[in-house]
């Protein structure tokens, strides 16, 4: 059984695209091996519904959800609810017992709050989850990557590598300038597993699988 925790430097950076691409690849090239997708916590509507449409024959789990689309501690306070992380852990553990691969998507960024005391980095480190960091290709990507890798090290996260994701159409020159792989690997001492180009339709499973096949997947599976 393999578990990958997909985290980002921030919200809306491509975590769902990367998770979808990895799921599409597994469904296409490892169809005989079971797959589970879990959104550990969700606020508002979005990711879970996307996975259910994209992967109708895959078990998609969301152990904890709030209606208000803000950070979980704020959402829980607004809805007069608690944040039972044991429920989240149990949902993940149950899925791990039954699947060959579990793709777990985080929320927000690595430093985003999960409770009033804990961040996504705390969960990744304390739960020992092999983690992939998704970084958007834009001006400032180098600093974001360095800062988040440092945060991962501080919390003893098992960081397997970095995947860059293009949030909009970019030229080759822009990609090279915004996310110079050699420089980033030198600064972070962490492998860059590849680049996810901009996709207008993130529910095209064939394109998603093709894009994922260009990543250095031997580092993950």
UniProtKB/Swiss-Prot annotation:
Keywords: ATP-binding, Biotin biosynthesis, Cytoplasm, Ligase, Magnesium, Metal-binding, Nucleotide-binding. GO terms for biological process: biotin biosynthetic process. One of its GO terms (molecular function) is magnesium ion binding. It holds the Pfam family AAA_26. It catalyses: (7R,8S)-7,8-diammoniononanoate + CO2 + ATP = (4R,5S)-dethiobiotin + ADP + phosphate + 3 H(+); (7R,8S)-8-amino-7-(carboxyamino)nonanoate + ATP = (4R,5S)-dethiobiotin + ADP + phosphate + H(+). Its EC number is 6.3.3.3. It comes from the Bacteria. Pathway: Cofactor biosynthesis; biotin biosynthesis; biotin from 7,8-diaminononanoate: step 1/2. GO terms for cellular component: cytosol. Mg(2+) binds at residues 16, 47, 105. It is found in: Cytoplasm. The active site is at 39. Substrate binds at residue 43. InterPro entries: DTB_synth_BioD, P-loop_NTPase. Its cofactor is Mg(2+). ATP binds at residues 12-17, 47, 105-108, 165-166. Belongs to the dethiobiotin synthetase family. Homodimer. Catalyzes a mechanistically unusual reaction, the ATP-dependent insertion of CO2 between the N7 and N8 nitrogen atoms of 7,8-diaminopelargonic acid (DAPA, also called 7,8-diammoniononanoate) to form a ureido ring. This cyanobacterium does not encode bioA (which catalyzes the formation of the precursor for this reaction in the cannonical pathway), instead it encodes bioU, which replaces bioA and also performs the first half of the cannonical BioD reaction. Thus in this organism BioD has a different substrate. This is ATP-dependent dethiobiotin synthetase BioD. It comes from Crocosphaera subtropica (strain ATCC 51142 / BH68) (Cyanothece sp. (strain ATCC 51142)). The lineage of its organism: Bacteria, Bacillati, Cyanobacteriota, Cyanophyceae, Oscillatoriophycideae.
């Amino acid at each position: 059984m393999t578990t990958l925790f997909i985290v980002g430097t921030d919200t809306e950076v491509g975590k769902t695209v990367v998770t979808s691409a990895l799921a599409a690849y597994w469904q296409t090239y490892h169809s005989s091996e079971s797959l589970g997708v879990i959104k550990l916590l969700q606020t508002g509507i979005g990711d879970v519904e996307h996975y259910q449409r994209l992967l109708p024959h895959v078990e998609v789990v969301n152990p904890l959800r709030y209606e208000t689309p803000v950070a979980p501690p704020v959402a829980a306070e607004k809805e007069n609810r608690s944040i039972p992380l044991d429920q989240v852990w149990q949902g993940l553990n149950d899925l791990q017992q039954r699947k060959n691969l579990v793709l777990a998507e985080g929320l927000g960024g690595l430093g985003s709050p999960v409770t009033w005391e804990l961040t996504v980095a705390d969960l990744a480190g304390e739960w020992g989850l092999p983690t992939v960091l998704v970084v958007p290709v834009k001006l400032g990507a180098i600093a974001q990557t360095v800062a988040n890798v440092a945060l991962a090290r501080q919390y003893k996260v098992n960081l397997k590598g970095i995947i860059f994701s293009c949030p909009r159409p970019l030229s080759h020159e822009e990609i090279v300038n915004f996310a110079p792989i050699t420089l980033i690997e030198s600064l972070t001492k962490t492998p860059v597993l590849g680049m996810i180009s901009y996709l207008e339709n993130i529910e095209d499973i064939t394109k998603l699988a093709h894009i994922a096949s260009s990543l250095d997947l031997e580092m993950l599976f």
